A protein has these predicted regions:
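Transmembrane beta-strands of outer-membrane beta-barrel pores
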Residues: 33-41, 64-66, 80-86, 104, ...
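Repeated loop/turn-to-beta-strand initiation elements of outer-membrane beta-barrel proteins
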Residues: 70-74, 107-115, 146-154, 195-201, ...
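Outer-membrane beta-barrel "beta-signal"
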Residues: 255-256, 280-293
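Membrane-embedded beta-strand positions in outer-membrane beta-barrel channels/transporters
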Residues: 57-61, 95-101, 137-139, 184-186, ...
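Detector for outer-membrane/organellar transmembrane beta-barrel domains
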Residues: 139-234
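Residue-level signature of outer-membrane beta-barrel architecture
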Residues: 62-66, 102-106, 142-144, 148-150, ...
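Short glycine/proline- and aromatic-enriched beta-strand/turn motifs that initiate or cap beta-hairpins
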Residues: 25-67, 83
Length: 293
């Protein structure tokens, strides 16, 4: 029963199905709805500039899982997501994209290790178009289930975000603040406490471009490589792109109602150390009801 529970949780979180013997395609449909809260949406480092907000979230994905062999599976999905914020409506988002996920299992039984390869692309359209962009992400993960209740994995991720708008305000400095790239590594573990409850932890480190939106500030100005006005948070706020390292610790809990639905909670604590001694923190939490057909 615990193996069935874990398969449900993984599917709801990753839009992926387990490996099955038949060579026919299995249709997938996922729908999520929830709420989120972020204590520092604009990633400001001065307390007077920090802005917090909450949002309603909706997402859906549909596609097919193909059992290529007894050990190999390929999942192809198209997905859509939306975020609607309470205060900062410029962050309201509609995103459309697609994902390809390949999984290989090295042997039989629950203890056999696996490898996961994921490629995804999306277009994000925001109410304030400074953030409009196309995203591409590549991810690789290797993991193993050590008991029927406990598994662990580690992986790496490459991210690229292509900004659609370039509103330069300083001669010689780009206005494509949200033209970003980064690399990250992570380790995660999950434990099924019961037939319904799954707990998880993840630690990650990311190095790459980050964006901080603050009021005009000389300290961050001199270390930025892109600058643009950011009316989302106020007429006197400016978005700055700079290099930084972000450390993230995340705790998760998932409660399965049945074989198709679950309630998922996640809490994340982030710290970013950026060029020029800029340091900022954020805390976020989200609660999502996930359903799979």
């Amino acid at each position: 029963m615990r193996s069935k529970l874990r398969a449900l949780h993984v599917t709801c979180a990753l839009f992926a199905a387990g490996i099955s013997a038949p060579a026919t395609a299995e249709w997938l449909l996922d729908a999520d709805g929830g709420v989120l809260y972020d204590s520092n949406l604009n990633r400001a480092y001065k307390s007077a500039d920090i802005r917090a907000d909450g949002a309603f979230t909706l997402s859906a994905a549909g596609g097919s899982h193909f059992a290529l062999s007894g050990a190999d599976g390929l999942t192809l999905t198209a997905n859509a997501r939306s975020e609607i914020y309470h205060r900062f409506h410029g962050l309201n988002l509609l995103g459309l994209g697609g994902t390809a996920l390949y999984r290989h299992k090295f042997g039989l039984g629950y203890a056999a290790p696996w490898i996961l390869l994921v490629a995804s692309a999306s277009h994000d359209n925001y109410r304030d178009d400074i953030r409009d962009s196309d995203r591409v992400e590549l991810r690789a993960e290797i993991g193993k289930r050590f008991t029927e209740a406990f598994d662990a994995a580690f992986g790496g991720r490459l991210e690229r975000r292509y900004a659609k708008n370039d509103e330069a305000v300083v001669p010689g400095i780009s206005g494509k603040v949200f033209d970003l790239r980064g690399q990250s590594a992570y380790a995660r573990a999950g434990y099924a406490v019961s037939d319904q409850l799954l707990l998880g932890i993840e630690l990650a480190v990311r190095r790459g471009d980050v964006v901080a939106t603050t009021r005009r500030d000389f300290q961050i100005f001199v270390v930025s490589d892109a600058i643009a006005p950011d009316p989302t948070f106020g007429s006197d706020f400016v978005a700055y792109r700079l290099r930084g390292t972000t450390d993230t610790a995340k705790l998760t809990a998932s409660w399965a109602f049945d074989n198709r639905s679950s309630l998922n909670f996640a809490y994340a604590n982030e710290r970013t150390d950026a060029t020029g001694g800029i340091v900022y923190r954020s805390h976020s939490a989200n609660l999502v009801y996930a359903w799979r057909y």
